């Protein structure tokens, strides 16, 4: 329906309601249906609220709905429909639009709707309309619960909502232009409520225990009734002017008179007897112009005091996001009869309704029966009525419901939550700041009421006050609250009134706390601090054990005897041990030193058989370089090698031992359970006051002091008292030595009405005198005026610069002697080029005289000029670039000359080189030495494909892609992928499966040994299920892995299991909105099945069963023919087990090969193959190739 048709239908519908003639409204026969049509139109209006605007422009509420409401009340269906339509029409504009629109066009519609709402409010300001509503509400409340229907409850709620909506409409200040003691539209509305008796019904709903379901509606209406009022003014209505009020008014008039007299004197000085056409020009000595000369002044001398270099300059525009928050609350004094009515309403409300209503509202809030942010009305009512009770006849029993520790805790929790939300929800920061202000006012009134109870003549009231104060001052949260509020104060969101209330509340709290401490003598308070676990100090030295060389020599005979027994009786030797950690992030090639450390630990612990088993296992894993002995080593040589390992200082990583893993887990659990450590200590008021000696807090006080003319006398007193506590009480006058504050003092002292601010003037003179006394001793104090200072700078200004360093001399590191520097230089030059070790750790292992830290050694190396920067010694993750020594270059040249005619030059060099480097580093060095001219010369040479070999039974052996030697395809790889081994871990999961297949199988085997077989089966089934779904649906999307059992959930939290997931290409949760690990969309169904197959324990066991018997130890590995025969035997065995003929297998292989896309990328892991080949070569087992390479299928876009 377009806009034109909507206008026509709205016009027809409004005309069908009826007409007003001579004060009597004549309704049409289909009036009820027309009202329902209007409700339906409002339900379907657009975002500009066009229907609402057209009805407001037609004044449908003033001309039709109000007359129907007042004259046709007996027609109940029509009356209910009109009430329902009026509730919709008077809905606040903020609820209609969600918030104040920022777009200019939408803001125009917002302001238009607001204008119509203000017209509705003016139309309702009549006794007749509220009289009908009051009578209807009275009749409905007379019905008992057994007679009241659901329609009656709906009508009660709608009437309360209608009253709420009318009172919620803000006043149009520009249109009304009302002053104090003048009747505004809001005052007329309140008077109509009073005359109609609606206020009595609100009091009844507040006090009745049977009508508690309307408590939040009633509280919201009452808060809107007193929106522009102040409790102190209402409490003093009709009691005459008090002496204190008269003295305050006289002081304000005296200030105005003094300023007016000063202005008259200034104007008199400016009036000259002669004209100023021949006044002349003057030079202002000491005031420089743009150049080096003095300023030339062309005006009269009487204008000299108003001279400024900023005259004529364009004022600097403050960005909108940095502008100070504006005051939104407007306080005005209503007409006398309205104030008298409101005062009587407050008194009766406190007498009969406050405690039951606040109890019911608190119950709704705690049971979450209220709407969002309804607690703000609760805190407003608490602040307003407790202040009214204090200003009138103070009776603590009238507000006993909200005078408890639970209320303090509730307000403090909301206040903390509001400022935390203000920091996180930046878009709604202004709204959170307003709620924060309401909570602060409630907290202020709670403290003021408790303070007033101290002066009550009743002993029971004073005892209650003492108990409350004892609990408040004991808890740390209440003491830290004001410090946190000052730190989080932001002028962009908090108006000046918030800062004023915060300063006054802090003043009251400190005054109560100081008085309480003096009366008690000593006060025990609660102290909370976060318990931080100190990391275990691990020795940075190379030797982790404290045995001297002599002790090690004495230990060796016993170890040698155990080793001889193991050699004579093989049954005494232990089973082989895995010498490396397969789940570690450190590559296996780099774990050789750690394996040697484990051997040394076994020897020092007296476990010679375990050390021997580790040595033999490490020899199989790392045969290169004969670091753990040659493959044909004799038992005697093994003993000598173990003796060398025992006496050699080895570098150790700063990690806890395996035996302490359980203790660490227990400590982590204790740390989670005991995050905060609670203790008690004796309270020191001065120590607490020192927490306020901060530049952030002082700047907030100075900001409020700038408006000292607009501040009340009490506010200025609170500012002066706090600054005096910091300056005189703590002896930190230098904290206030700031140029902007001195400019403010200058303006204060030159104010004509300075006599009215005696306290501020006295304090300003005191601070300025202290500054000049310090400046006579410390000339740098003038420069310090430009900066805000903390307590450390204040101490240096007053006690001398460098006093902080002298105070902490006991914590300084000892000086380096010339002998230590010479030893440091010698050690650094000797070990800086040694690969595979940290030069700083090696130096620390040899520095025995004075214990040094790593940081001290590094900084002294830089200071001595041996190193250029500290960054040279930073521990980098991954493989570090190690310089090639001359011997290593010669070895590389020898190996190249030896294997230059072989099919795989680079592979042979990688197998036989002593110092292990990545393929990319070896290739780069070969190019740098000029041994090869281009990388292509190092590619593995492809052999000519021969006719397919026949099996023993005469059948052809199919050659699947997974059976091919991955090294043959090495030349098809990109250079970066085939050579840079370091980047394999950083590849995506789809590109790194080939290199991670073997490590995934090893991880799966270790996880099965730990008892995680069931989670592995669940993971495998999830991968297969995802592969089936992707084949059926044809589309791929990330699939979460949701553990449904407790065992699977614990496995997902296991670090080793997570490492396996990463190896398989499953990605962890990427953001705060994701909880589960996900199978990426880029993995195809074929890849998922291959990954699942790598987890199959049965397949691994079958492969191990089919492996031939080990051969003679010491052989370097099977030949190419032996390897081919082993592969064929393995394939035929698999066929016999699966019952699959060779023809079917060949067809299946051909289908898989032909169905592959055009773009194929083959990834392999030469390093892992070489390692496995060496391991099997040492043990004499023929190497059987498993699936080491996968086809990564890339879809063409």
UniProtKB/Swiss-Prot annotation:
Any Pfam family hit: TIMELESS_C
Start-end of Acidic residues biased regions: 656-673, 963-985, 1099-1109, 1143-1153
Residue list for modification Phosphoserine: 281, 1071, 1084, 1165
Localization annotation: Nucleus; Chromosome
GO MF: enzyme activator activity; identical protein binding
Region (DNA-binding domain): 810-949
Induction per the UniProt record: In retina, expression exhibits a circadian rhythm in the presence of light/dark cycles. In the suprachiasmatic nucleus (SCN), isoform 1 exhibited 24 hours oscillation, isoform 4 is constitutively expressed. Shows a circadian expression pattern in the intestine with peaks at ZT4 and ZT8.
Reported tissue expression: Predominantly and robustly expressed in proliferative organs (spleen, thymus, intestine and testis) compared to those more differentiated such as kidney and liver (at protein level). Expressed in all tissues examined including brain, heart, lung, liver, skeletal muscle, kidney, placenta, pancreas, spleen, thymus and testis.
Required for homodimerization and for interaction with CRY1 and CHEK1: annotated span: 1-309
GO terms under cellular component: chromatin; nucleoplasm; nucleus; site of double-strand break
Disordered, as annotated region: 647-674, 943-1002, 1088-1197
Biased composition (Low complexity): 986-999
Location of the region described as Interaction with PARP1 in the Swiss-Prot/TrEMBL record: 997-1095
Record PTM Phosphothreonine, positions in chain: 1086
Keywords: Biological rhythms, Cell cycle, Cell division, Chromosome, Developmental protein, DNA damage, DNA repair, Mitosis, Nucleus, Phosphoprotein, Transcription, Transcription regulation
Region (Required for nuclear localization): 1079-1197
GO biological process: branching involved in ureteric bud morphogenesis; branching morphogenesis of an epithelial tube; cell cycle phase transition; cell division; cellular response to bleomycin; cellular response to cisplatin; cellular response to hydroxyurea; circadian rhythm
InterPro entries, alphabetized: Timeless (IPR044998), TIMELESS_C (IPR007725), Timeless_N (IPR006906)
Domain notes: Residues 1172-1189 comprise a putative nuclear localization signal; nuclear localization is required for the regulation of period length of the circadian clock. The DNA-binding domain (residues 810-949) binds to both single-stranded DNA (ssDNA) and double-stranded DNA (dsDNA), and has high affinity for DNA sequences rich in guanine that form G-quadruplex (G4) structures.
Protein purpose: Plays an important role in the control of DNA replication, maintenance of replication fork stability, maintenance of genome stability throughout normal DNA replication, DNA repair and in the regulation of the circadian clock. Required to stabilize replication forks during DNA replication by forming a complex with TIPIN: this complex regulates DNA replication processes under both normal and stress conditions, stabilizes replication forks and influences both CHEK1 phosphorylation and the intra-S phase checkpoint in response to genotoxic stress.
Similarity remark: Belongs to the timeless family.
Quaternary context: Monomer. Homodimer or homomultimer. Component of the circadian core oscillator, which includes the CRY proteins, CLOCK or NPAS2, ARTNL/BMAL1 or ARTNL2/BMAL2, CSKN1D and/or CSNK1E, TIMELESS, and the PER proteins. Interacts directly with PER2; the interaction with PER2 is via its second PAS domain. Interacts directly with PER1 and PER3. Interacts with CRY1. Interacts with CRY2. Interacts with CHEK1, ATR and ATRIP. Interacts with CLSPN. Interacts (via N-terminus) with TIPIN. The TIMELESS-TIPIN heterodimer binds preferably to guanine-rich quadruplex-forming (G4) DNA structures.
Entry protein name: Protein timeless homolog
Organism of provenance: Mus musculus (Mouse)
